[in-house]
A protein has these predicted regions:
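Beta-strand C-termini and the immediately following turn/loop, strongest in propeller blades
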Residues: 50-56, 65, 90-91, 99-110, ...
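Serine-hydrolase catalytic core recognition
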Residues: 219, 273-276, 281, 287, ...
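Signature of short aromatic-glycine-proline-rich micro-motifs recurring in repeat-based ectodomains
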Residues: 34-40, 84-90, 183-203, 274-275, ...
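Beta-propeller domains
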Residues: 211-363
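Short loop/turn segments that connect beta-strands within beta-propeller blades
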Residues: 66-68, 120-124, 162-165, 253-257, ...
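Non-catalytic accessory segments flanking enzyme active sites
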Residues: 34-41, 47-61, 73-75, 87-90, ...
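Predominantly five- to eight-bladed beta-propeller fold
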Residues: 29, 69-72, 103-108, 112-115, ...
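Blade-loop segments of beta-propeller domains
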Residues: 69-96, 100, 105, 133-136, ...
Length: 728
């Protein structure tokens, strides 16, 4: 009996040891990584989809039936080819070919380059799409007729015919930091979220593509360490008020070998955030936007195969939208026939769905109300339904809906209270629903078009069970008032036993950038467990969505226009004062932490709110909007020449004299997004004002500051800072 008790005690001690929630467990193991359904690819007939699975150490692309949730066969297995590692794949419409990307190498946030191989499902041969000695390719994509693949290499556009694998070079003038064909420049990739710059026509006989002339864009240099002599990485980065790339749109005819330019007009200081082919034969739609990003025109050009040499293309304006502030670029445009398109707009004060007849300009609003449509998934011609995601129940949640374009009747297709995302079959008879909430990881279900659950694909039962061992607290969703009496959405995480005598330190987590929320009823990954670990140390953790954040209508989101940082800072200060008045919060020990825009916010709060905040952590912060890229900055601030006063008034570098508390500044030296320059200029001002602070740089790390033991080191450093300044 005694030995048995000793054994039980030993087991309990072991369990206790391994159930200690700490940074090592969070950041250097895969203990808390949720399972997911990987590589979902709806197949052409609408009855099947493919998914990526790891089985017995090999990667497999599996074909599934939606109706039966049954494996129908393995389309491709890496074990047949020496377990070749691939990171992405595409299946041709006829399922004859599979395109896989290997040895993928990141370039910037969205972009990468790979060696691409194409697999013939009939003869089971795997071939490189091009001579690998010429370098890696980018953005490879099948033509709609399944006979060709287009791609970019070294800033030039190419395609191959799959019948003979002959490579055809479309452009020849591509040059790094000078001319880009078929891809986008840095600022388009970052701020318009596109890196692909070519698009097949519906018939597969033409390719429309971007041409970026970067020659007049100023160059930014980053030092890269790790060698005896540091090297310089150079790329074109247009900062606020500076020159952009000159943009051209060309259409290449594969049969005539001719390239025809799309006339964008005389004004070259414009943006072209999207191009796409309509359902009309040979009609290209170009989205043209002015530099202030408050006027958007949709232009049409027809490119007929039999067009005589040197004949220009007639350009027609199909649609125009303007704003007194700015317009968001979205991917909700769907051409449903030769005359009508689905469109979303904030023109009535909230983001809603419209049907636009682009022949005569007539429009019909399909959804309305004091809520925002967040994404449009597609249009089902058979039942006249548009499928979409919306923050209809709350700005903190997302649901899946359908709406009939004739009756305007809306049906709810999801049932989980939290965040729902959908991947629809090509015939819209089925969709895979990805659901999570603030305290539970992803739950995948296969549903029919009415939302009825047909099958459960992944429930993350193992992770949920594991989480029970750590006695985690719940995120509580609340509202807090700002100085003007506006109720702001927030969440709070509190220790199970609150100490109203000694009280608790508070850490506020902030982002606060335009349209971006941190108060979401969804799974938030590893930061969720880090916050939980702080709660176990006695911290209260909270986050507040200030003015300027999303899904509360245009007025709320656009209230920070021309004055970034002003109202957001006031709201965070108001929230800190509110929390400080709670009987379990030590108002002398309030800290704030943010990354990127959040680092900008935490830097403003510790200076402008010096009497409220005791400590602040700023990771990779913008410290002066003059240092940031022009598309983002000018969208919300206009140019420094037009709005210089507000650039300066709300820049942290101009408020360091107010600093009283503890300030930790962290940045990666190879941050291509928010340049290391921002932190160095902040350091200069802090030194000039004789302010004590902590500063740490991660050599050769980008905006994400990760790789190897980097994240563990970073979070250990932040833990030590918080414990030293908020707990002692």
């Amino acid at each position: 009996m005694k030995n048995w008790l000793l054994f039980i005690t030993f087991i309990l001690l072991i369990k206790t040891f391994f159930c200690q929630l700490n940074n090592e467990l969070i950041w250097s193991t895969n203990t808390f990584y949720p399972k997911t359904v990987r590589g979902i690819n709806p197949l052409e007939n609408g009855e099947h989809y493919s998914s990526l699975k790891l089985r017995n150490g090999s990667q497999e692309i599996i074909k599934f039936s939606y109706k039966k949730n049954k494996e129908l066969g393995v389309l491709f297995s890496s074990k047949d080819f020496n377990d070749i590692k691939f990171y992405d794949y595409k299946v041709s419409n006829d399922q004859k070919w599979i395109l896989i990307a290997t040895q993928t190498e990141s370039i910037y946030r969205h972009s990468s380059k790979s060696y691409y191989y194409v697999y013939n499902t009939k003869n089971r041969r795997l071939e490189s799409i091009a001579d690998t000695s010429k370098g890696k390719q980018r953005l490879a994509e099948f033509s709609p007729d399944n006979n060709k693949i287009a791609y970019v290499r070294n800033n030039n556009l190419y395609y191959i015919n799959l019948n003979d694998f002959k490579e055809i070079q479309v452009t020849t003038n591509g040059e790094i930091n000078n001319i880009i064909n078929g891809a986008t420049d840095w600022v388009y990739e970052e701020e318009f979220s596109i890196d692909k710059g070519f698009y097949w026509s519906n018939s597969g006989d033409k390719i429309a593509y971007y041409v970026f002339d970067e020659s007049k864009v100023k160059e930014f240099q980053m030092k890269m360490y790790g060698n005896i002599y540091p090297t310089h990485y150079k790329f074109k980065y247009p900062k606020a008020g500076e020159k952009n790339s000159n943009i051209g749109i060309n259409v290449y005819n594969l049969f005539s070998k001719r390239t025809i330019p799309f006339d964008l007009g005389k004004n070259s200081d414009i943006y072209v955030p999207r191009i796409m082919w309509s359902k009309k034969k040979d009609e290209l739609i170009v989205f043209k936007m002015n530099r202030l990003q408050n006027k958007l025109e949709l232009l049409s050009g027809r490119f007929y195969s039999d067009m005589p040499n040197n004949t220009g293309v007639r350009i027609n304006k199909l649609y125009e939208e303007t704003s007194n502030t700015y317009l968001d670029i979205h991917d909700n445009t769907i051409f449903i026939n030769e005359n009508d398109m689905v469109w979303t707009s904030e023109k009535d004060g909230y983001n809603h769905i419209y049907i636009i007849d682009y022949n005569n300009g007539n429009e019909k609003q399909i959804t309305n109300g004091q809520w925002d449509v967040t994404e449009v998934y597609g249009y089902d011609e058979n039942n006249k339904n548009i499928y979409f995601q919306a923050a209809k129940e709350s700005p903190t949640r997302r649901e899946i809906y359908s709406v009939n374009i004739e009756t305007k009747e809306i049906d709810l297709l999801s049932n989980g209270k939290g965040t729902n995302e959908a991947e629809f079959s090509n015939n819209f008879k089925y969709f895979i629903n990805k659901y999570s909430n603030a305290d539970n990881p992803y739950f995948f279900t296969l549903r029919d078009k009415s939302g009825k659950v047909l099958f459960e694909l992944e429930n993350n039962e193992e992770l949920i069970s594991k989480m029970l061992d750590f006695d985690l607290v719940k995120k509580e969703f609340i509202t807090v008032p700002n100085e003007d009496g506006i109720e702001l959405n927030a969440w709070i995480m509190k220790p199970t036993k609150l100490d109203t005598i000694s009280k608790h330190p508070l850490l506020m987590f902030v982002y606060g950038g335009p349209g971006i929320n941190t108060v979401n009823d969804e799974w938030s990954g590893m930061n969720y467990f880090w916050f939980q670990s702080l709660v176990k140390k006695g911290f209260v953790v909270a986050s507040v969505d200030s003015r300027g954040t999303g899904y509360r209508g245009k007025e709320f989101k656009h209230s920070t226009y021309l004055q970034l940082g002003k109202y957001e800072t006031r709201d965070q200060i108001s929230a800190a004062q509110y929390f400080g008045n709670l009987n379990f919060i030590d108002r002398s020990k309030i800290g704030i932490f943010g990354w990127s825009y959040g680092g900008y916010m935490s830097s403003l709060c510790i200076t402008k709110g010096a009497d409220i905040f005791n400590s602040a952590i700023a990771v990779a912060p913008v410290t002066n909007w003059r240092y940031y890229d022009n598309i983002y900055t000018e969208r919300f601030m206009r140019t420094p020449a037009e709005n210089g006063h507000n650039y300066d008034t709300n820049s942290p570098i101009n408020h360091v004299d107010k600093l009283k508390g503890n300030y930790l500044l962290i940045h990666g030296t190879a941050d291509d997004n928010v340049h290391f320059q921002n932190s160095l200029e902040m350091v200069n001002e802090l030194v000039n004002n004789n302010k004590d602070f902590d500063f740490f740089a991660y050599p050769d790390k980008n905006h994400g500051i990760y790789g190897g033991m980097t994240r563990l080191h970073l979070y250990n450093k932040m833990n030590k800072f918080l414990e030293n300044n908020l707990q002692q």
